[in-house]
């Protein structure tokens, strides 16, 4: 989506956000996997404007490096400018204009960094309206059932935009108006610069209000237009954590619906949370209580959930992931994971593999067709194809100072309760006996067993634990075993 080259966007993100009651700058609070500022800049970047400027103030030293990272990921330049003192939105825009070339003469779009649902399509409509009407300014408006806190749109009898009055400066009758300023504008730069130079701080907040530019341009005889949108959530701002949660839920509803329309079955949208950068293939079923976060990628025809959280996890086609918590891992096609499986970063499960109940994996590669069915820890290991790791096995990877790797070949069968003390190698086709502690390499095809013959110490419980329920049970059992059974053929 592109427009004529002479379009610049200024994003206002200098506010302190005191109502958030947070040590985190307001625009860095997240929803659907992105900060509010990131949502805004992603939308602005889709317009491909000639210039993109972010105005920072409060906590600029924390926000500016993140803007630079985002600019790199978006593959475009984003200029940052600083508002030294909080003198109002009018002053913030003036700071933003200072980052533009002196000879810039095109359209300036002004928006805020705390409207995370604002999309590129809405901005495109605003710019098209602005260009079609040859206006000095076009303001985006919407109608709210409860407009408290928003600037009201004042219109003339012929319905032209006359001015914008802030909540704190509005009369009782003006506060009854439900059409509000969405805080998004398209300006001709020369008209904007002229009006900014005449702003006054003679108001309740003693600040330079950007909306006052509307009345100034109107008095100058300039054309002032408005673009009304019915979907007010697109321009809803965030000032506190209640609004953050409300917009987060609304954004999630839209994300889930988009996946449903693309061929994904979501059994219970109310308990399903999907980040904006998640991709899900067709005919996949998402069960209740599932969170798909970060850059998680799900293939076609998968079954995910219930009660599953995946963060930056790749899942191949036809895989099943049930009651699993996983991050920074890869699950192969037709693999089965869960229930109650913990995938820590660096886990790679091959095609058709299985990680079952109460299995934890970390920094390990598990080959195609290999099964780790239950009650096992696999850390810092490389396991070949079509092997089976018995229940209760542990990869002992830490020696108190360093993590060591274990390598298990293909077609290996390990008995229940095997301990692989790394570093160690087990060759292809080898077997291990139940309870074996593997401290040395096992050759291909060998059976590894450890420990001496079992030794039973008779009557130990009665001697060492006399009077206990165990001792009494043992006494009775011994007595029963020592009593000969009656002779069935004996006659009285």
Curated annotation (Swiss-Prot):
This protein's UniProt keywords: Acyltransferase, Cell shape, Cell wall biogenesis/degradation, Cytoplasm, Magnesium, Metal-binding, Multifunctional enzyme, Nucleotidyltransferase, Peptidoglycan synthesis, Repeat, Transferase
Enzyme Commission number(s) of this protein: 2.7.7.23, 2.3.1.157
Region of interest: Linker: 242-262
Residues reported in the UniProt entry to bind UDP-N-acetyl-alpha-D-glucosamine: 12-15, 26, 83, 88-89, 151, 166, 181, 239, 344, 362, 377, 388
Residues that coordinate or bind acetyl-CoA: 391, 397-398, 434
Any one GO BP annotation for this protein: regulation of cell shape
Chemical reaction(s) catalysed: alpha-D-glucosamine 1-phosphate + acetyl-CoA = N-acetyl-alpha-D-glucosamine 1-phosphate + CoA + H(+); N-acetyl-alpha-D-glucosamine 1-phosphate + UTP + H(+) = UDP-N-acetyl-alpha-D-glucosamine + diphosphate
UniProt cofactor note: Binds 1 Mg(2+) ion per subunit.
Superkingdom of origin organism: Bacteria
Residues covered by region (N-acetyltransferase): 263-492
Region (Disordered) residue spans: 451-492
This protein's pathway: Nucleotide-sugar biosynthesis; UDP-N-acetyl-alpha-D-glucosamine biosynthesis; N-acetyl-alpha-D-glucosamine 1-phosphate from alpha-D-glucosamine 6-phosphate (route II): step 2/2; Nucleotide-sugar biosynthesis; UDP-N-acetyl-alpha-D-glucosamine biosynthesis; UDP-N-acetyl-alpha-D-glucosamine from N-acetyl-alpha-D-glucosamine 1-phosphate: step 1/1; Bacterial outer membrane biogenesis; LPS lipid A biosynthesis
Cofactor(s) it depends on: Mg(2+)
Annotated binding of Mg(2+), by residue: 114, 239
Gene Ontology MF terms in the entry: glucosamine-1-phosphate N-acetyltransferase activity; magnesium ion binding; UDP-N-acetylglucosamine diphosphorylase activity
GO cellular component, one term: membrane
Subcellular location: Cytoplasm
UniProt biased composition (Pro residues): 483-492
Catalytic residues (positions): 374
Subunit structure: Homotrimer.
Stated role: Catalyzes the last two sequential reactions in the de novo biosynthetic pathway for UDP-N-acetylglucosamine (UDP-GlcNAc). The C-terminal domain catalyzes the transfer of acetyl group from acetyl coenzyme A to glucosamine-1-phosphate (GlcN-1-P) to produce N-acetylglucosamine-1-phosphate (GlcNAc-1-P), which is converted into UDP-GlcNAc by the transfer of uridine 5-monophosphate (from uridine 5-triphosphate), a reaction catalyzed by the N-terminal domain.
Family: In the N-terminal section; belongs to the N-acetylglucosamine-1-phosphate uridyltransferase family. In the C-terminal section; belongs to the transferase hexapeptide repeat family.
The name this protein goes by in its record: Bifunctional protein GlmU
Species, as recorded: Mycobacterium marinum (strain ATCC BAA-535 / M)
Gene expressing this chain: glmU
């Amino acid at each position: 989506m592109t427009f004529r080259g002479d379009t610049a966007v200024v994003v206002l993100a200098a506010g302190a956000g005191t109502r958030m009651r947070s040590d985190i700058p307001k625009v860095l609070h997240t929803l659907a996997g992105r900060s509010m500022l990131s949502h805004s800049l992603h939308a602005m970047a889709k317009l491909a404007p000639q210039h993109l400027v972010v105005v920072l103030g409060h906590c600029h030293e924390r926000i500016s490096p993140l803007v630079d990272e985002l600019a790199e990921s978006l593959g475009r330049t984003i200029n940052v400018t600083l508002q030294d003192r909080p003198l109002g939105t009018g002053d913030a825009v003036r700071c933003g204009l200072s980052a533009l070339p002196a000879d810039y003469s095109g359209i300036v779009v002004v928006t805020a960094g705390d409207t995370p649902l604002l999309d590129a399509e809405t901005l495109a409509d605003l710019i098209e309206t602005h260009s079609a009407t040859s206006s000095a300014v076009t303001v985006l408006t919407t109608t709210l059932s409860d407009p408290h806190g928003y600037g009201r749109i004042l219109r003339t009898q012929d319905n032209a935009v006359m001015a914008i009055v802030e909540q704190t400066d509005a009369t009782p009758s003006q506060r009854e108006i439900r059409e509000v300023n969405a805080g998004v504008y398209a300006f001709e730069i020369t008209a904007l610069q002229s009006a900014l130079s005449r702003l006054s701080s003679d108001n309740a907040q003693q600040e330079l209000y950007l909306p006052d530019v509307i009345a100034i341009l109107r008095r100058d005889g300039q054309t002032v237009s408005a673009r009304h949108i019915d979907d007010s959530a697109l321009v809803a701002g965030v000032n506190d954590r209640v609004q953050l949660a409300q917009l987060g839920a609304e954004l999630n509803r839209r994300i889930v619906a988009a996946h449903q329309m693309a061929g994904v079955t979501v059994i219970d949208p109310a308990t399903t949370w999907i980040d904006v950068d998640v991709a899900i293939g067709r005919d996949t079923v998402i069960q209740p209580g599932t969170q798909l976060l970060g850059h998680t990628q799900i293939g076609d025809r998968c079954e995910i959930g219930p009660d599953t959280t995946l963060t930056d996890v790749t899942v191949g086609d036809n895989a099943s992931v049930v009651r699993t918590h996983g991050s920074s891992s890869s699950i192969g096609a037709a693999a089965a994971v869960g229930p109650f499986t913990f995938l820590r970063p660096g886990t790679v499960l091959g095609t058709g593999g299985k990680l079952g109940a109460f299995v934890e994996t970390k920094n390990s590669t598990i080959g195609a067709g290999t099964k780790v069915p239950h009650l096992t820890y696999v850390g810092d290991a490389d396991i070949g194809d079509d092997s089976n790791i018995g229940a209760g096995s542990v990869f002992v990877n830490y020696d108190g100072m360093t993590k060591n790797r274990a390598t298990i070949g293909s077609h290996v069968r390990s008995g229940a309760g095997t301990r692989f003390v790394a570093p160690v190698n087990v060759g292809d086709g080898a077997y291990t006996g139940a309870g074996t502690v593997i401290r040395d390499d096992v050759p291909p095809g060998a059976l590894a067993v450890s420990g001496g013959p079992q030794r039973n110490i008779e009557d130990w419980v009665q001697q060492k634990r006399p009077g206990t329920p165990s001792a009494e049970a043992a006494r009775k059992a011994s007595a029963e075993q020592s009593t000969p059974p009656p002779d069935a053929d004996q006659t009285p």
